[in-house]
Amino acid sequence: MSEPIIVRQEAAVTILSINDAPYNRMSLDFMDRLEELVYEIAETASTRAVVLTAEGEDNFSVGMNLKQFAEGIERKGSADALLDQRLNVIRAIETMGKPWVATLFGYCLGGGLEVPLGCHFRLAAITDAQIGLPEMDIGGVPAWGGSARLTKCVGEHHAIDMILRAKKISGPEALRIGLVHEVHPIEELKAVAIRLAHELTAMPAGSIRSMLQVIVDGREKSLAELIQLEREAVIENRGTADSREGMLAFLEKRKPTFNQQS
């Protein structure tokens, strides 16, 4: 049986690729393996950025394998436990303090959008992408935090339109409403995502971790709480070797050499 996720390492970038082409369903084995990898990556200092993609160029993911729902309940003990696994994995991606870059191409539906919504960067294909939370079509609702994250990402207006109409949108439309950061030709998409991840690893890891905490936590905090959190990040950051090196390099008009201490 093939691995549900292909893992590659390029310097400080870990590349995870869903391995169930052409549909790249998010099977039970996929979610169990993703759970393992997420917590492993969080504790691996040598990984400073992650790319989440999929094999082939047909589809990122059509989402959960619905035929495995009953098996999943049996495996996890209850429907609630099965749901909590998904919610906890996506939340761990979101809060681990390392940037994740997701590639969206072909079908990106249900869980195939909800997992990328937990990532910090989303890049889409210019053509052929169909992105959405179409659970209404089968009498369901987004179950992995998708409705909340989509609303935070694109606003109530667009979230209502997409979810209540089970609407699938293109890459350029996703860019227009703020769901993705960039669009690229499908043949370039994965390379661009990996290049972006390498770019992020050149930044000071401690500063990235602090800012991701401020930004992600800011979705749930008041402005006053967020400002206090930012203040704490500033105090923590200014005592780091990377902060001192960055300031010294600026004054000396040279490129900084960060040691990536977090």
Name each model-derived stretch.
Residues S2, L248-S262:
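Terminal low-complexity tails and localization/encapsulation signals of metabolic enzymes
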Residues M1-T53, E57, R91:
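Conserved CoA-thioester-binding segment of acyl-CoA-metabolizing enzymes
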Residues V89, I93, T103, L109-I163, ...:
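CoA-thioester-processing core
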Residues A54-A92:
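Glycine- (often His-adjacent) and acidic-residue-rich active-site loop
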